[in-house]
Structures are given as structure tokens and as C-alpha cells.
Amino acid sequence: MITTVIIAIVCFAVGGGLSYMLFRYGLKSKYDIIIKEAQTEAEVIKKNKLLEVKEKFLNKKADLEKEVALRNQKIQQAENKLKQRELMLNQKQEEVQRKRTEAEAIKENLEAQIVIIDKKKDELDKLQMQEREKLEALSGLSAEEAKERLIESLKEEAKTQAASYINDIMDDAKLTANKEAKRIVIQSIQRVATETAIENSVTVFHIESDEIKGRIIGREGRNIRALEAATGVEIVVDDTPEAIVLSAFDPVRREIARLALHQLVTDGRIHPARIEEVVAKVRKQVEEEIIETGKRTTIDLGIHGLHPELIRIIGKMKYRSSYGQNLLQHARETANLCAVMASELGLNPKKAKRAGLLHDIGKVPDEEPELPHALLGMKIAEKYKEKPDICNAIGAHHDETEMTSLLAPIVQVCDAISGARPGARREIVEAYIKRLNDLEQLAMSYPGVTKTYAIQAGRELRVIVGADKIDDKQTESLSGEIAKKIQDEMTYPGQVKITVIRETRAVSFAK
């Protein structure tokens, strides 16, 4: 038993020792393997790093070589440029030297020629002096006296030639200007077509039956008095069947009265309170219609940027007239004529059209200041920030201020064309006859005038002068003086042509 135990203990001890030895041997082997692997990996890393460093070195070397090559190339190019420049400078230097040599040769040649010329000049002066002495001896005049006589004769000849030349130029300019002006005016008129509108100072309001007249008059005339007080229009109710006459010089008031009457008659309620209500409503409608008319007019004409108050004034032109011609129609016609004429003359047609539309705005305000309508219109345009050339065209279209823009004469001419065309305006017969008589009497006031005739509705004045009192040259100045006096002292539409006629008659009798 004990032996068995001892054997077991010995076996255990031997087994433990063997196990320990085997364990130590295994650890050493594994350590050796790890060391070998580490050494191998270190060798690989070392080789990789060496390769990487070598690659970087080679790349850096290649980059440096490229940079050096590029710099060498630039240096070579710079050297080539310097060589070329040096070559060019050498060539230029040679050229300068050559030209300097040529210049010196030319200078020497010129100096030699100057010496020759000076000698010849001295000889010529001597010859001239000898010839002058001979001429003075032959003519009996000194050189200064002969020179003065020659200059005087040349002056007279030059004056005669200049006068003839000026007359030719003036005749040609008059002929050309006349033809061109006629062409432009005719073309402008042909390209503008407008209606003829004749306004009256009365409006006839038609009613269905005469029974309505009594309702309009009201008890003891209270309705008609209320209507007249509200509108400012005289209402004439007479025996004219189915008609009531509205009389007022202000077309806006007449239009308000007409529309108010139409609404009252249609509604059937006619009494003072209702009349005031309807008139106030209609007045507002008419004001809106005025603004709408102004806007529509500017849109039709292609005019933009006008002040709202100017648009209102343009709309109000619809209810104004001048010598029976509707003012808005006249303004539109003048605007279109201005645009056409400005285009023909190479000016801005839009600005000309704007000036033509606004030229009569001074006739619109209800108050009547002391200023003429052209100057008042100019002040209104300036107030609402219109450009200076537009304002000048408005103010100068009746020569009441100096024309400082090219638009002014265009507006003046187109205004005259629009107002002077047949059927455009209507004048009172007495005023028409008086104007003709005034024209004839004005011309008769000049000495030497024997007869005068106003023809073509006062657009031409023929003046007969005595041949023994006025010569041909004086006829031209007389026509100019008469034209200026008519322009300064008279008011007339369009233009007046003055023709002075001088006739010489020789009468003999054979017996």
C-alpha cells in the first residue's frame, strides 16, 4: 500500500517535472517564432520605407529637373529676345545713322540752294526796283498811289461779285426752302385725317312729349330754378315742340345739365332735392369721364409720363372750343401734324407730338387770368415739370415769347395748319368782315399805296402801288413792313401773304 502511494507520488512528481520542462520548451519556441516574425516584418517595413523614400527622392529629383529645365528654357527665351532686341536696336541705330547722313546731305543741299535763292532774290529785288522806277517815270504815280488805286478797283470788283453771289445763293435758298416747306406741309396734311367738329353754345334736349315740360318747370317754376342754380345753365322752355334748350358758354355745364335732365326724366322723380342729388352725381361722372378721356387720348397718341393734372386738362379740352373748333380735336390734329413734320425734318417726333398736344392747355382753366393762353399754358407745363423745350414750344407758338427750341416753330406752323384748313373754325361774320377791312386799311396807311384787296378769306393781301412813287427795290421792303405790322397789330388764323404789285403803263395815241 505504502509502496503504491510512493510510486504514485514519484510518478506525479516525474510527470509534473516533465510537464514543466515541456511547457518551458513550448514557450521558448513560441518566443522564437514571434521574434522571427517581428524581424521579418521589420525587414519588410524597412524595405518599404526605403522604397518609399527612394520613390519620393526620385519624384523630387524629377520635379527639380523639370523646374530647372523650365527655367533654363525661360532663360534661353529671354536670351533670344534680348538678342533679337539687340539686333533690332543695331538695325535701328544703323537706320538712324543712315537717315542722319541723308539729313546732313539734304541740309547741305538746302543751304546751297538758299544761298542761290538769296542771290536770285537780290537780283530780283534790283530788277523790281528798276522796273518800279521805270513805271513811276512812265505813269507819273508813286508805287503807293498805284497800289491804292489797284486795291480800290479790286474792292469794287469783289463787292460786285459778292453781291451777285449772295443774290444767287438767296434765290436758290428761297426756291429750295419754298419747295421743301410745301412738300413737308402737304405730306403732313395728307398723312393726318381728322373730323371737323363745330361746337355751339346751346344744347337741345329732346323729350318724348310736351307734358314733361310742365314737370321739369315744376310748381311756380321751382324745379327749373333749382336745376339752373345747381348747373349754372340757362334752361329755355318755349313753344318748340318736344325740345328744351340748354344755353351756356361752358360746355361742361351744358353736358352736366343734359345728363342730369336725362336721368331725371327717365327716373320720373323731379323735385329740388332730387335735382341736387342727381346733379352732384352727374358732376362726379363727368369729372371721371374727363379723366378717362385724357388717359385715352394720351394712350391713342402714344404719349407717356404726363402729370395727372395735365391728363385732366387734356380731358377737359373735349368740352372747350376755339372759333367753333373742338379744342381736343384741334390738339390731337396738331400733335399728329407735329410728329409728321418733325420726322421729315429729322427731329424727335415723340417730343413734337407731346408739345403739339399740350400747346393749347392755357385755354382750359376756368379762371381767366390776364396772361395770354400761350404763356399761361407754358406756366402750367413748367408747374408740372415738363421739359424746357416743350414749355418753350407751348409759350412761343403765338410769338409771345422768344423761340429757343426747334420744336417751337413746328408747333406754331402745325397749329396754324390745323386752325386755317377749310371748315376747321367758324368765325362770326361781323368779325370776319372787320378783319378784312382792317387788313386793307392797314396797308392803305403806307404812302404810295393806291389800292388794297384782301382775298382768299383774308389769307392774302394784294397791295397796288403807284409806279411813280415807289420803285422796284422799295416794293420788297414795303411788303416786309406790312407783314411785320400785321403780325404785331392783328390777330389772324394761319398766315397772310402780302403781294405788292407795281405796274408801269405807257399809253400813246396814233392820229
Curated annotation (Swiss-Prot):
Would the keyword Membrane be found if you checked this record's keyword annotation?
A: yes
Recorded GO cellular component terms are: plasma membrane
Identify the residues that the record assigns to the KH domain, covering every copy. Answer: 201-261
Q: How does it sit in the membrane?
A: Single-pass membrane protein
An example GO BP is: mRNA catabolic process
User: Which sequence ranges are marked TM in the entry?
Assistant: 2-22
Where does the record place it? Cell membrane
One MF term in the entry's GO annotations: RNA binding
EC assignment: the record states 3.1.-.-
Q: Which UniProt keywords apply?
A: Cell membrane, Endonuclease, Hydrolase, Membrane, Nuclease, RNA-binding, Transmembrane, Transmembrane helix
Q: Matching HAMAP family, A to Z? A: RNase_Y
Cited NCBIfam families: HDIG (TIGR00277), RNase_Y (TIGR03319)
Tell me the function of this protein: Endoribonuclease that initiates mRNA decay.
The record's PANTHER family line, in alphabetical order, gives: RIBONUCLEASE Y (PTHR12826:SF15)
Protein name stated in the entry:
Ribonuclease Y
What organism is this sequence from?
A: Phocaeicola vulgatus (strain ATCC 8482 / DSM 1447 / JCM 5826 / CCUG 4940 / NBRC 14291 / NCTC 11154) (Bacteroides vulgatus)
